């Protein structure tokens, strides 16, 4: 299915509406019914007397949810304000301006409307602009927007500062696993960083769709900066129940990804989450994905006595990623087959009744 150039809700037929989710995938909790279950952790004193206390708080959050929020993280509030302001300015540009950086057709970085795996029938209600920032040699500035004018300078600084914060958090997680503090960073080899800016416009029927479908991130950790609207949701029971993460001004939401989950031998959860939308206001979030290099080996860094590895054998991160994508595609294919079969049965039943 080709990506659209703008988000348009088809009112006349929900069957033809490419944004309508199956009933079991639709939001169960409102975007603004906030939960306090996700801990908010102050990083003040992380390099001093509070390090052990902070480590304990992060460990508990990773074991319970794979998600926590951090404040007092040292990232300048002006940088956060500049980054979010420029992001909103970009999405308010005319469509043709944004489409100059269209990333369909396999282009690495740029702008796209909606998102979905190739082969999936349903799309997400969002626009995104993304760029690859680390390793520096992989940057392709031709794919970075040139409007607003300050975009490149601010996003470069933002990427650098968040790389530093991510490495600091990985040190704490390494120590929590009983390893040297550089262990997780070393396991990433030459750490990748990808920044995805999400814009979720108002939606006419938000109860039928998602801004971003349920998933876990493939990488090590993700740092999410979100506005105060609300819409990030998490589950820890396989999707039976959901909570909406309460936005905290200036905080980063930290999600543990699949790579971090495997390196911890399953001790730390990979955050199971989604984004919902609403009919009242747009929402903005900026996700910074910290991923291992494609050739990095994925396998538990420490297996305690009496435990077994949750992985059958080591694999590269690229192999892990491809396996994850193929599994997701196969699940989507099987679900679509079941849905099509059910629709066929619903057509046949009335015909059978006529001749009964």
Swiss-Prot record:
<feature type="domain" description="Fe2OG dioxygenase">
    <location>
        <begin position="188"/>
        <end position="292"/>
    </location>
</feature>
<dbReference type="InterPro" id="IPR026992">
    <property type="entry name" value="DIOX_N"/>
</dbReference>
<comment type="similarity">
    <text>Belongs to the iron/ascorbate-dependent oxidoreductase family.</text>
</comment>
<dbReference type="InterPro" id="IPR044861">
    <property type="entry name" value="IPNS-like_FE2OG_OXY"/>
</dbReference>
<dbReference type="GO" id="GO:0031418">
    <property type="term" value="F:L-ascorbic acid binding"/>
</dbReference>
<dbReference type="GO" id="GO:0046872">
    <property type="term" value="F:metal ion binding"/>
</dbReference>
<feature type="binding site">
    <location>
        <position position="217"/>
    </location>
    <ligand>
        <name>Fe cation</name>
    </ligand>
</feature>
<protein>
    <recommendedName>
        <fullName>Naringenin,2-oxoglutarate 3-dioxygenase</fullName>
        <ecNumber>1.14.11.9</ecNumber>
    </recommendedName>
</protein>
<dbReference type="InterPro" id="IPR027443">
    <property type="entry name" value="IPNS-like_sf"/>
</dbReference>
<dbReference type="GO" id="GO:0045486">
    <property type="term" value="F:flavanone 3-dioxygenase activity"/>
</dbReference>
<keyword id="KW-0847">Vitamin C</keyword>
<feature type="binding site">
    <location>
        <position position="215"/>
    </location>
    <ligand>
        <name>Fe cation</name>
    </ligand>
</feature>
<dbReference type="InterPro" id="IPR050295">
    <property type="entry name" value="Plant_2OG-oxidoreductases"/>
</dbReference>
<keyword id="KW-0479">Metal-binding</keyword>
<feature type="binding site">
    <location>
        <position position="273"/>
    </location>
    <ligand>
        <name>Fe cation</name>
    </ligand>
</feature>
<comment type="function">
    <text>Catalyzes the 3-beta-hydroxylation of 2S-flavanones to 2R,3R-dihydroflavonols which are intermediates in the biosynthesis of flavonols, anthocyanidins, catechins and proanthocyanidins in plants.</text>
</comment>
<comment type="pathway">
    <text>Secondary metabolite biosynthesis; flavonoid biosynthesis.</text>
</comment>
<keyword id="KW-0223">Dioxygenase</keyword>
<dbReference type="InterPro" id="IPR005123">
    <property type="entry name" value="Oxoglu/Fe-dep_dioxygenase_dom"/>
</dbReference>
<feature type="binding site">
    <location>
        <position position="283"/>
    </location>
    <ligand>
        <name>2-oxoglutarate</name>
    </ligand>
</feature>
<dbReference type="Pfam" id="PF14226">
    <property type="entry name" value="DIOX_N"/>
</dbReference>
<keyword id="KW-0560">Oxidoreductase</keyword>
<keyword id="KW-0284">Flavonoid biosynthesis</keyword>
<keyword id="KW-0408">Iron</keyword>
<dbReference type="Pfam" id="PF03171">
    <property type="entry name" value="2OG-FeII_Oxy"/>
</dbReference>
<dbReference type="GO" id="GO:0009813">
    <property type="term" value="P:flavonoid biosynthetic process"/>
</dbReference>
């Amino acid at each position: 299915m080709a990506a659209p150039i703008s988000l348009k809700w088809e009112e006349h037929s929900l069957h033809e509406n490419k944004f309508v989710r199956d009933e079991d995938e639709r939001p169960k909790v409102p975007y603004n019914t906030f939960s306090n279950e996700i801990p908010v952790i102050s990083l003040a004193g992380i390099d001093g007397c509070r390090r052990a206390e902070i480590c304990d708080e992060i460990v508990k959050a990773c074991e319970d949810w794979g998600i926590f929020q951090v404040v007092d993280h040292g990232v300048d509030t002006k940088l956060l304000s500049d980054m979010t302001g420029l992001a909103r300015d970009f999405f308010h540009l005319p469509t043709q301006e944004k489409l100059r950086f269209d990333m369909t057709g396999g282009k690495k970085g740029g702008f796209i409307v909606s998102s979905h795996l190739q082969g999936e029938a349903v799309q997400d209600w969002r626009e995104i602009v993304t760029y690859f920032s680390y390793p520096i040699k992989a940057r392709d500035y031709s794919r970075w927007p040139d409007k607003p004018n300050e975009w490149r300078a601010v996003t470069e600084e933002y990427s650098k500062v968040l790389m530093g914060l991510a490495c600091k958090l990985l040190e704490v997680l390494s120590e929590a696993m009983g390893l040297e503090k550089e262990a997780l960073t070393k396991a990433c080899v030459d750490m990748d960083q990808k920044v995805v800016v999400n814009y979720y416009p108002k939606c006419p029927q938000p109860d039928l769709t998602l801004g971003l479908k349920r998933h876990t991130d493939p990488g090590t950790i993700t740092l999410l900066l979100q506005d105060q609207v609300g819409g990030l949701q998490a589950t820890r029971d396989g999707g039976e129940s959901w909570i909406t993460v309460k936005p905290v001004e200036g905080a980063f939401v930290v999600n543990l990804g699949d790579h971090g989950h495997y390196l911890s031998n399953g001790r730390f959860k990979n955050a199971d989450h989604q984004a919902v939308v609403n009919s009242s206001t747009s929402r903005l979030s900026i996700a910074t994905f910290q991923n291992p290099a494609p050739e990095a080996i994925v396998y538990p860094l420490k297996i305690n006595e009496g435990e077994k590895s949750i992985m059958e054998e080591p694999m590269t991160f690229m192999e892990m990623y491809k396996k994850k994508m193929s599994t997701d595609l196969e699940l989507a294919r099987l679900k679509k087959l079941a849905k099509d079969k059910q629709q066929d049965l619903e057509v046949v039943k009335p015909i059978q009744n006529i001749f009964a």
